[in-house]
Amino acid sequence: MMKFLLIAAVAFVAVSADPIHYDKITEEINKAIDDAIAAIEQSETIDPMKVPDHADKFERHVGIVDFKGELAMRNIEARGLKQMKRQGDANVKGEEGIVKAHLLIGVHDDIVSMEYDLAYKLGDLHPTTHVISDIQDFVVALSLEISDEGNITMTSFEVRQFANVVNHIGGLSILDPIFGVLSDVLTAIFQDTVRKEMTKVLAPAFKRELEKN
């Protein structure tokens, strides 16, 4: 039924600026996204999502002090992705006879928590501790195209840059300079490695569900 409705709506949108037709296809695309999210959330690999271990060297400067060290993140799990939700309506446009839609997906309470064990070497310090990193602005942006036949194609998928990551590092106060150094390094790793790993899991899952015939 959804595909039939998309075919009818696309035919009108491709040739008309009538807001009624845009409203109809927006409604159908919204439903397709909601159904995809519901299906993805049933996967046992989504929440918690396991992220590969990561090791790195780092160097930071705080005032006149240089901090050089190494760290290893193990047993990394992302929690909260079962709370994904569509943010607002699909932004639907007809361009040269092609219907395109852009959407944002977030999570309830806007937090995805990463839990992991952290071992770091910094001077004479060689501790292992537990860390919880709260990603407080987890957002996925994706784009779709809908064919005349009502088929959906996902044309882009991006886990957006994290602008607000709050780290809770066991055994360290936020007033400790070492906390600031480690927090900065960990946040940089999230922006690069962790976002890529999340994309590897989420992008194929959304593509599979949205492009089902």
UniProtKB/Swiss-Prot annotation:
It comes from the Eukaryota. It comes from Dermatophagoides farinae (American house dust mite). The lineage of its organism: Eukaryota, Metazoa, Ecdysozoa, Arthropoda, Chelicerata. It is found in: Secreted. Pfam families: Grp7_allergen. Residues 1-17 form the signal peptide. The gene is DERF7. Glycans are attached at residue 151. Keywords: Allergen, Glycoprotein, Secreted, Signal. Belongs to the mite group 7 allergen family. One of its GO terms (cellular component) is extracellular region. This is Mite allergen Der f 7. InterPro entries: Mite_allergen_7_sf, Mite_allergen_group-7.
